[in-house]
Amino acid sequence: MNVKDFDFYLPEELIAQHPLEKRDTSRLMVLDKETGEISHKNFYDIIDYLNEGDTLVLNNTRVMPARLIGEKEGTGGKIEFLLLKRVDKDRWECLAKPGKSARVGRRFTFGDGKLKAEVVEVKENGNRIVEFYYEGIFEEVLDSLGEMPLPPYIHERLEDRERYQTVYSKENGSAAAPTAGLHFTEELLHKIKEKGINIAYVTLHVGLGTFRPVKVETIEDHEMHSEYYHLSKEDAEVINETKKRGNRVISVGTTSTRTLETIADEDGNVKETSGWTNIFIYPGYKFKVVDRLITNFHLPESTLIMLVSTLAGKEHVMNAYEEAVKERYRFFSFGDAMFIK
């Protein structure tokens, strides 16, 4: 299947640059995966499409303020590190900008010397392994000095960094937010629980690979990046009981979907487990556990639009995206949502 099959025209002004004042007032396109029928709602209407006994699966990862801007010791030259993943207690794999400044042995300082760093290795892919030196707790130091690593298509500064976190975010480790979850408020989640809908959590730490364009012509040739995931025993039991009763598992976001489909056996059962996944879901894949999906509007030719097309049918999805452009929906991380019912 050709990557170009997932292209569509998107005017730049439809790329949302900031979140709406109230999370659940974003628009919601409801797409029937069987008929392709489309209806236009607001996100707070999602509760009308959830039935008692269903389980909503949320990714509770938390975005780290992983962008550090500092200077080279001695010369004061500027450096930017983007923390990708922890490889040891105080060692992180990072992207460095400008790369030529970040040679092995070079030392850098951040925030009046509150945090120091040394490049200890340059990997084949150009990423750096960086050792950090600090006093206290690293997460707290990072919280005071780091900036949110917003996606490359967002050019406006984010006033409130909590708006790039879900209200239920808990486990630190992502370089990007699981954006389908940004629409939920505490109040909406409370109403959902009151209706008898279960809530289960997975953790998948979203990597920067989520923004990496597909550079091959044939989608089968694309290799996905690896991301760390975890599912607890309690949450696995909630999901298995839901399937056993004949109720639906409704995944919030492509990250929750990829986690569940990685863990599920052929019968759709899941169990407590942790690991790394590079699962790539594209048309032809048969879903084992996910029945319905809440997601945002994704980039043309992205692996995310391919995943959505696998659940709802490519023709239905491409028609829905054409309609979304015509109706001037807001796209990408701070944009509107779609429910595939």
From Swiss-Prot:
What the entry lists under InterPro entries is as follows: QueA, QueA_dom1, QueA_dom2, QueA_sf
Q: Write the Enzyme Commission number(s) for this entry.
A: 2.4.99.17
Provide any one GO MF term from the record: S-adenosylmethionine:tRNA ribosyltransferase-isomerase activity
Keywords, in A-Z order: Cytoplasm, Queuosine biosynthesis, S-adenosyl-L-methionine, Transferase
Location relative to the cell: Cytoplasm
What's the chief localization of this chain?
cytoplasm
Enzyme category, top tier: transferase
Q: Which biological processes are named by the entry's GO terms?
A: queuosine biosynthetic process; tRNA wobble guanine modification
* Database matches in Pfam families: Queuosine_synth (PF02547)
> What GO CC terms are in its UniProt record?
cytoplasm
The pathway entry for this protein reads as: tRNA modification; tRNA-queuosine biosynthesis
Q: Which reaction does it catalyse?
A: 7-aminomethyl-7-carbaguanosine(34) in tRNA + S-adenosyl-L-methionine = epoxyqueuosine(34) in tRNA + adenine + L-methionine + 2 H(+)
Q: Which family does it belong to?
A: Belongs to the QueA family.
PANTHER family the UniProt entry points to: S-ADENOSYLMETHIONINE:TRNA RIBOSYLTRANSFERASE-ISOMERASE (PTHR30307:SF0)
How is the quaternary structure described? Monomer.
Q: What does this protein do?
A: Transfers and isomerizes the ribose moiety from AdoMet to the 7-aminomethyl group of 7-deazaguanine (preQ1-tRNA) to give epoxyqueuosine (oQ-tRNA).
Q: Which HAMAP family match?
A: QueA (MF_00113)
Q: Any idea what this protein is called?
A: S-adenosylmethionine:tRNA ribosyltransferase-isomerase
Q: Which organism is it from?
A: Clostridium botulinum (strain Alaska E43 / Type E3)
